[in-house]
Amino acid sequence: MSDHQFTPQDEIFMRRAIEVAKQAEKEGEVPVGAVLVKEGEIISEGWNRSIGSHDATAHAEIESLRKAGQALENYRLLDTTLYVTLEPCPMCAGALLHSRVKRIVFGAPDLKAGAAGTVLNLFESQASYHYADVENGLLEQECRDQLQAFFKRRRKEIKEKRKQDRLLEEQCLESDKASNKNKVCNKK
């Protein structure tokens, strides 16, 4: 981790990552967004797509790396900066190191799987063949708020669905009793 003073340009790119994360949320995915920049220009963007694509590796960072590799026709993404709303997990940290991204800037720490200093730090591991500068905390509260609002809404939806399922089951049981039939209601 570094004690870095963020620039106005850093803030612009992180705000874009927050916007990109909204696309993930629209698709029912965890709202994490990533923007890869080279020489002050966005070369790729990615958002979480794991659920919809049935692909555990389709994290925002990986999606952005894949697009950049195709655009630049090279998996080595030298002299690039990745802005991501949530601290990279171990898988994404490994991909970022392997692709040689020079700088990673993340907003919110990942208290469960953060691999850039919160839980572990793969970027400072002696096992790493490549190194990257990692800076954290840029627009942290906005990134954190976006994720927390999503999970609060998701928990409420799950709770409501369970409540509806219980009511339907109770109605079916009452219906069975009233008709003196020994059958099980079909929940579909």
Go through each PLM region and give its residues.
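Residues at secondary-structure transition points
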Residues: 4, 8, 12, 30-31, ...
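Short beta-strand scaffold segments in enzyme catalytic cores
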Residues: 32-40
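Residues that line or immediately flank small-molecule/substrate-binding pockets and catalytic motifs
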Residues: 50, 84, 108
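Helix-adjacent hinge/juxtasegments
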Residues: 58, 62, 66-99, 103
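Short beta->alpha transition motifs characteristic of CBS
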Residues: 43-50
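Zinc-dependent deaminase
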Residues: 1-24, 95-188
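Small-residue (primarily alanine) positions within well-ordered alpha-helices
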Residues: 17, 21-24, 34, 44, ...
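Short, basic and Ser/Thr-rich N-terminal targeting/leader segments
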Residues: 28-32, 78
